[in-house]
């Protein structure tokens, strides 16, 4: 910031930190949160902490002002259009994921889409600019029909396969946004059931960011979804050792997630006693989300069923169902 008072990317970085801290405090910084469909115009979410919301809005406003000034000075410069694209793209992401306003994010998202398209028109070699366009193409393809029609009318392009290819091209291109493209592919490959590809991206991210323990949580979850329980158990056990030694702040409900996922892997591996201990720790966690407890009770039901204890199995499955309904009814807790 002191080195260049006109650096939009520095202000954008500060806004990004505030956004990520909000997700961390809510416990929503994992792939699990984004595997469902996009069917609603708005999603009820708990209000963001006022201090962090203020920090985000202050820095994104400054970043936007600086990016606009750069664009006015250099209207045919690809980098100026790129700075505008990523700035308003971040604003759109915040509106959708923190405020829950899907339609409210359309204006900023459309600007980001148009600006990134302009970057590629001015300089097709800048493959990294395709990350924004690719993500929006994919997102539009996953919307319910009414929302998809609204997106088309607003000027968005669709096409899932084209979108994924653009993101893959951005992930393969060495740039400051390469890691962002890899993180995007982790999510989208999980959504598409391409678990091997997601694991490949996660392995590279683990190499680049060896202190980011959540990458081991995501690797374990991805391996579990892909039917690789032994790999999942190994990744999650390694991550839990990192968690125990890490003095940094934990994500809300984080420990419950770790033990719940490892417990599920151990159920699949028929390590039932070890699995039960993990799952009990998940249920006992004071900050465990309802859906996390629901999944833990489901796995305990499986354990009871494998032990031929039908009464315990039924009771645990009923507890799981009850917690899933509670999570739906009280979505403002998320």
Short names for language-model regions:
Residues 177-191, 221-231, 237-290:
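Alpha-helical adaptor scaffolds
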Residues 8-9, 78-79, 127-129, 176-180, ...:
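Boundary/linker segments of alpha-helical solenoid repeat arrays
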Residues 2, 114, 121, 171-172, ...:
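Amphipathic alpha-helical segments of tetratricopeptide repeats
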Residues 19, 113, 117, 155-159, ...:
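TPR/TPR-like (Sel1-like) alpha-helical repeat modules
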Residues 13, 20, 83, 90, ...:
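"A position-specific structural signal for the A-helix of alpha-solenoid helical repeats
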Residues 6, 17-78, 82-126, 130-191, ...:
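Short coil/linker segments at helix-helix boundaries
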């Amino acid at each position: 910031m002191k080195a260049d008072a006109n650096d939009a990317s520095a202000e954008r970085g500060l806004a990004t930190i505030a956004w990520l801290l909000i997700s961390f405090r809510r416990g929503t910084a994992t792939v699990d949160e984004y595997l469902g469909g996009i069917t609603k115009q708005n999603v009820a979410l708990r209000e963001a902490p006022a201090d962090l919301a203020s920090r985000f809005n202050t820095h994104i406003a400054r970043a936007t002002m600086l990016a606009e000034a750069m664009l006015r000075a250099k209207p045919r410069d690809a980098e100026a259009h790129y700075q505008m694209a990523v700035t308003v793209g971040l604003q759109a992401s915040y509106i959708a994921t923190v405020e829950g306003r899907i339609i409210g994010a359309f204006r900023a998202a459309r600007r980001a889409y148009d600006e990134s398209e302009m970057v590629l028109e001015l300089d097709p070699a800048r493959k990294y600019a395709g990350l924004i366009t690719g993500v929006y193409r994919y997102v539009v393809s996953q919307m319910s029909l009414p929302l998809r029609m609204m997106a088309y009318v607003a000027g968005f392009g669709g096409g899932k396969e084209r979108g994924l290819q653009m993101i893959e091209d951005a992930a393969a291109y060495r740039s400051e946004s390469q890691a962002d493209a890899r993180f995007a592919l982790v999510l989208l490959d999980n959504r598409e059931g391409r678990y091997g590809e997601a694991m490949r991206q996660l392995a590279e991210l683990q190499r680049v960011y060896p202190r980011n323990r959540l990458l081991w949580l995501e690797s374990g979850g991805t391996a579990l979804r892909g039917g690789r329980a032994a790999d999942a158990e190994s990744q999650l056990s390694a991550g839990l050792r990192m968690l125990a030694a890490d003095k940094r702040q934990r994500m809300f409900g984080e420990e419950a997630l770790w033990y719940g996922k490892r417990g599920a892997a151990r159920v699949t591996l028929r390590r039932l006693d070890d699995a039960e201990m993990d799952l009990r720790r998940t249920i006992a966690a004071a900050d465990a989300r309802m859906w996390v407890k629901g999944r833990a009770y489901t796995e305990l039901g499986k354990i009871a069923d494998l032990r031929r204890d039908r009464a315990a199995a039924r009771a645990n499955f009923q507890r799981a169902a009850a917690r899933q309904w509670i999570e739906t009814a009280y979505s403002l807790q998320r």
